């Protein structure tokens, strides 16, 4: 399944305790459809010490959240937006772009390949 967000994208949280916050995507799990967003959805984990290996205590970890709960912030217009895909063909090269549906500007290049001549 192709996601409309990538690692490193700036996103806005739409639901949950961190609703309205803007941060960057650190990890995407395509199998479960979840993302880990920096400093969002933080939980405390109680960890027992293991002698010689790790120190015990209470650690804060970022939990994954469903991708449907975040929305990409367009780098051009700086607004949360839906994302579309656009395919352009020029000089025998096919390029696929992600684009902002609010300002209609290309966000980035998804892939580029030469068109096969038959």
From Swiss-Prot:
One Gene Ontology biological process: translation
Molecular function terms from GO: rRNA binding; structural constituent of ribosome
One cellular component term from this protein's GO annotations in UniProt: ribonucleoprotein complex
Keyword Ribosomal protein in annotation: yes
InterPro entries: Rib_uL2_dom2, Ribosomal_uL24, Ribosomal_uL24_KOW, Translation_prot_SH3-like_sf
Keywords: Ribonucleoprotein, Ribosomal protein, RNA-binding, rRNA-binding
Entry similarity comment: Belongs to the universal ribosomal protein uL24 family.
Family annotation (PANTHER family): MITOCHONDRIAL RIBOSOMAL PROTEIN L24
NCBIfam families, sorted: rplX_bact
Complexes and interactors: Part of the 50S ribosomal subunit.
Protein task: One of two assembly initiator proteins, it binds directly to the 5'-end of the 23S rRNA, where it nucleates assembly of the 50S subunit. One of the proteins that surrounds the polypeptide exit tunnel on the outside of the subunit.
Name the UniProt record assigns to this protein: Large ribosomal subunit protein uL24
Source organism (scientific name): Hydrogenobaculum sp. (strain Y04AAS1)
């Amino acid at each position: 399944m192709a996601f409309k967000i990538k690692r490193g994208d700036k996103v806005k949280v739409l639901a949950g305790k961190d609703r309205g916050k803007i941060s960057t995507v650190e990890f995407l799990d395509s199998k479960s459809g979840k993302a880990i967003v920096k400093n969002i959805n933080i939980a405390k984990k109680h960890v027992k010490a293991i002698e010689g290996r790790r120190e015990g205590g209470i650690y804060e970890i970022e939990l994954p959240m469903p991708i449907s709960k975040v929305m990409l912030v367009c780098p051009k217009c700086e607004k949360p937006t839906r994302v579309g895909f656009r395919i352009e063909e020029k000089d025998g090269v096919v390029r696929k772009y992600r684009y902002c549906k609010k300002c209609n500007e290309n966000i980035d290049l998804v892939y580029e390949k030469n068109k096969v001549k038959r």
